[in-house]
């Protein structure tokens, strides 16, 4: 699948460019059944040589319609949430000081869990990202707690962007 090549290319780009700090970030689609294994393997591979820093962005998933066709995603949101939160815990326990993580989430529980883990593990290398116009209350709360927050704006032609934006609205209807 194309995801295999994207994973390998992203890992190689981190090896090449993240020598002094994390410049290149790899996105982990945590709704995929193989995502946690890929994440842990990347940590193990890096720890064996310790010659570059990890840039990691955890998302629940972005290509639902395409990935569903290949039977590679969890069947329920509960399973996806569990896998995502397991990833949050793993990176907060196993990271090096210069590793950098972005948690792209509108999920209050995942954010609260990460804040707890940041404090417990005394790390400061986790930032947050949310879609512009969604979860502004969570973003504001994070900023008030001196956390780094990124707002992103998807772009593209309407035909390609509409399914993504519609799904984001549907998934996050309760928080609007």
What are these model-derived regions, one by one?
Residues 1-176:
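Positively charged, amphipathic and often flexible ligand-engagement surfaces
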């Amino acid at each position: 699948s194309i995801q295999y090549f994207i994973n390998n290319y992203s890992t190689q780009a981190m090896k090449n460019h993240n020598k002094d700090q994390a410049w290149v970030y790899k996105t982990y689609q945590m709704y995929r059944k193989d995502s946690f294994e890929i994440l842990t393997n990347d940590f193990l591979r890096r720890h064996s040589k310790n010659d570059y820093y990890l840039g990691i962005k955890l998302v629940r998933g972005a290509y639902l319609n395409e990935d569903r066709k290949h039977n590679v995603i969890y069947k329920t949101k509960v399973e996806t949430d569990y896998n995502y939160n397991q990833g949050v815990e793993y990176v907060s326990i196993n990271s090096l000081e210069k590793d950098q993580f972005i948690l792209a989430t509108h999920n209050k529980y995942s954010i609260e869990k990460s804040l707890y883990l940041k404090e417990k593990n005394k790390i400061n290398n986790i930032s947050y990202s949310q879609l512009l116009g969604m979860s502004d209350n969570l973003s504001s709360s994070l900023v008030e707690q001196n956390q780094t927050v990124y707002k992103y704006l998807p772009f593209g032609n309407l035909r390609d962007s509409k399914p993504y934006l519609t799904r984001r609205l549907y998934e996050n209807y309760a928080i609007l």
